[in-house]
Amino acid sequence: MLRTLLKIAAGLMLGALVTAGVLYQFLGLRLVMDGGGIPRPMFVESAAEQAARVERHRAAQRAQSPPLPSPATAASETGSGAGLEAGVQTRADLETLATDPGTGTGAPGSVAAAYWTDFRGPNRDGEYREGPLRVDWPASGLTPIWKQPAGAGYASFVIARNRAFTIEQRGSNEVVAAYDVASGRELWTNAWPAEFRESMGGDGPRATPTWFDGRLFALGATGELRALDEGNGKVIWRTNILSDSGAGNLPWGMAAAPLVVGDAIVVLPGGPANQSVAAYDRATGKRLWSTMGDMQAYSSPMLVTLLGVPQIVFFSSSRLVGLSADGSKELWEYPWPVMNGINATQPIVVGDNRLFLSSGYGAGAAVIELSKASDRLTVREVWRNTRMKNRFASSVLHEGVIYGLDESILAAVDANTGELKWKGGRYGYGQLLLVNGRLIVLTEDGDLALVRATPEKHDELSRFHVLDGKTWNVPAIAGGYLLVRNLAEMAAFDLRTTR
């Protein structure tokens, strides 16, 4: 019986390989894994073809566009450390820190302000609170104000002072790029030799850059961490967090967005022997501290306050952890083992002392409650079930209800009880944000959908196609502009209510 099953499995595998070869040879199609691990035929360019297409577009863009008043100087370093002194500032030169890391200059509600400065927004919770947006989308959809080719990778955008920043794979280089939000024009790039190739997940960098106080902190898939000048992309300092920590890379690459905590940039290299979480000086790149020995995961750290205690909350491969903001003490933990350590979504703060967490691969979801006990915080499980399984699309919270993708189907769950309110609509393994009581869903197939955030029923208001190819990247919004991208394209929409 076992021998027969093995023969059948081998035959199926051989058949899949033959099918893949035929599709590629005669139709130019390749089998690409979707978020559920199912192979799907798609048109996929080679890395060289994609890089050449992006460069042709950018060259034509430069030739046709008049100069912008903001700097548009390209800066490219080889990774050897050359030219790292350019633009270095001392800590005394930095502006006084704002209470909210997302605070910047410019009029409130304008893209000139520094608002969407972190992965999934200023609070990393996927909610847009800057002001009203247009939510009267026609059923036929919206027209992008610009759309253009992009390099590979799963990073999102951050947006500050009329610029959108992201990181892409272009040929054999990882490239941080700055774009003018209104026109899509590329303002500068900073590139270094690095290639992350992964047949199931896809190629390119995963971690979204972080903007703070005129600097961009970008992490590549192979551990390269750079502080860049927002105006021209010049390197202020650089390091490799994997080399620094003696850590090996994760199977799907470094994915955690750098986190600003006071004067520090906190990252998750996952090294052994107190090297798992590390902090670097924002101004100089000097290593400040490191702690813990967990293997890391694919979620980004968050700076939150629970029970009046500021803390860094993050997923490792096997647990959710609360760490003191200075890295000196583990405050609490909640075991959360997942197949292959794939914790890839963001926890959500639910009130003063509760957190929602979820993972896919059968793990499900839970709400935990923290209480003070002496000098440590204790954890109580409020509820846990499998009604919400976020594989790598994080949920959002609206008026006591959690909205998210239960694997590939949208669902609503009561945050207090875990009760399923509804489940409906198929969006693949896409991403979603909360805006003015609506859910903006970017589907795995590249559609944009607008869904009413209500516990009553699944109510999709509009849906239309935007991007071609597998789409796992989180959308970004600032100043009324919605930006989306995937492994091959990027686009922008004007959702301002007044213009």
Question: Language-model segments: which ranges?
Answer:
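Aromatic (tryptophan-biased) beta-strands that constitute blades/sheets of beta-rich domains
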Residues: 4-7, 11, 20-149, 175-177, ...
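Short loop/turn segments immediately following the C-termini of beta-strands
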Residues: 121-124, 169-171, 221, 270-272, ...
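Blade-level signature of beta-propeller repeat domains, shared across WD40, Kelch, NHL, RCC1
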Residues: 363-365, 470-499
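Loop/turn-rich, solvent-exposed surfaces of beta-rich toroidal or solenoidal domains
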Residues: 363-365, 387-453
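Extracytoplasmic beta-rich repeat domains
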Residues: 145-158, 189-210, 238-260, 270-275, ...
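Short loop/turn segments that connect beta-strands within beta-propeller blades
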Residues: 180-183, 229-232, 281-284, 324-328, ...
